[in-house]
Amino acid sequence: MPKSSDGAWSEVFGVRVPDERSVPVGAILGTETSSPLEWWVAVAQDQYLQLDDVVLVRTAVAGAEALTKSGELAISGVVDMVQAKHEASNYPSDVFLANEGVLPLQVARWAHVVSTRLEPELWVPPSPGDAVVRVRGLDREKALHFDGMEERLIAGLSRDGQPIFIDLSFVDGRRGAHVNISGISGVATKTTYAGFLLYSLFHSNVLGIRAANTKALVFNVKGEDLLFLDRPNTKLSDEDRSRYEALGLPHEPFRSVGIWAPVNPRSPEAIPDTGSRQEGVQAYFWTVRDFVKEGMLRFMFSEAGDERSQIADVVARVESTLQREAKDVPGSPATVYIQDQLGEDVHVKSFRQLCQMIEQRLEANDDQLLGHTARGTISAFMRRLDGARAQCGHLIKGDDASNPGEHRIDWTSRQVSVIDIHNLHDRAKRFVVGVVVKRLFEEKEASGSAEPLVFIVLDELNKYAPRDGWSPMKEVLLDISERGRSLGIILIGAQQTASEVERRIVSNAAIRIAGRLDPAEALRPEYGFLSDNARKRAVLLKPGTMLLQQPQLPMPLEVTFPFPAWATRVSEAAPTTTARSPFAEPE
């Protein structure tokens, strides 16, 4: 962050900012039309303006003395375009003559500004010749509406090293909820920025006393990026540390992290199936009893399909029949009694046995399961059930389950719970996400209270809530996007292409963020919050730079965020002297 010439600093909303006076940079251009919403600035020869600079012009308004104390209107705005040309040049070759001193041409620079605030709200344009200044300190906070934010979430730094804030009331559900992040995989740093927003939430004072009970569920859908949130990053430089300090944030890993990984299918013991991260990871699975009584079958058929498909009817009928008939087995918390095709109670000891029983009852034309379904539909259902058993079966244990309570994902045990699914088949990924999110939604719905807040971080939304087709997984996520705000469930979703995600999920996000975009994707209507110039910038953004749009501003702001203080891969993770489970009681 740049320092002022006298080296003085001031505190603005708890963040250190340079204590600089506003700098005159030019005047309102007279050769271009200005309006209350946008205007042009002629840049002085000894000054410059760049994209995202915040500027202010004060203009006299005749006859408005009764509306303004000083008779002046203050219009603030943000630069979104800068241009330059030779004045009085008629031919392309004139530039060479000017360089040789033959033609006395002068370089003119001017900038386009989008208005962000008018005080008082008097909708008149600035006058040509009015002085324009680049603002700092409180004038900048007013221009960007930061002064009206009661609780400010640190979003990162602007191009000139000034802090950028998000109004927390548009994140936590009071006035709006949900965050959506788009960008090219591997370049847009979507997951990293989602992690930074969580870090800012939990390691600043923005949540106040609510921080102790606020939780986050983070799904690690690819690679091992999120499996080291509790480990310091050895690659963090002194410059990165100074950026954290400038934002008023510590440069340390997440303080309270629980890591869950699927049970290893190749081991008879309930050990986690992970790669580089082995210590401090808890294996998760569900029991046959959980599967039957909590209605999990639908999430094994959660690939996008036609909403009118009769397979969905068969799934619903089988699921409800199993729930109705299931009886607990004394002394066996992981298994159940289910009726076979003869109507006799059978002790179901494994997921494989449960699938076989379902198939036997369907082949025996069990009316409770069949209804009026065609035989071809039943055959399709059984083929998919076989596939689900092969791809997800190791996640459902029966009488071979040891201490099942210890392996049930407990999102309340730590502030941040990372649920690893990156090694699973796509069907198994959808199953885990669907089951966990559905259970969370039902628990919050039963509590009837929005507190404590729960944040869900999920990448690759296009897989779990695609625009076309219907699935139980998509239905749950859509429900969260529409009703989660009132229940205190906040979705921080990310995807490469917003055009392939269910439209209502994207549009319900109050905070829209774009990293680097594919040129064709940037032209899609889902990015209507980006101006034409912003779309062009989006295809050039570097890792660590995002375009942030929030309701209080009419245009997106470019935001940069520090390199993660937590490790994102095993090569960055600081070694631990003693392996200690994150699920152990704090010392």
Tell me what each language-model feature is:
Residues 2-184, 197, 203-213, 217, ...:
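Basic- and hydrophobic-enriched, low-structure N-terminal and domain-boundary segments
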Residues 206-212, 218-219, 223-227, 252-479, ...:
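P-loop NTPase motor domains
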Residues 200-205, 242-250, 439-445, 476-492:
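Substrate-engagement module of ASCE P-loop NTPases
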Residues 478-565:
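Conserved ATP-driven motor cores of ASCE-family P-loop NTPases powering translocation/secretion/packaging/pilus
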Residues 230-244, 274-277, 471-475, 507-511, ...:
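Short secondary-structure boundary/capping segments
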Residues 2-13, 27, 54, 59, ...:
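Phosphate-binding and hydrolysis-coupling loops of NTP-dependent motor/remodeling domains
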Residues 241-276, 507-528, 539-542:
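Conserved P-loop NTPase catalytic core
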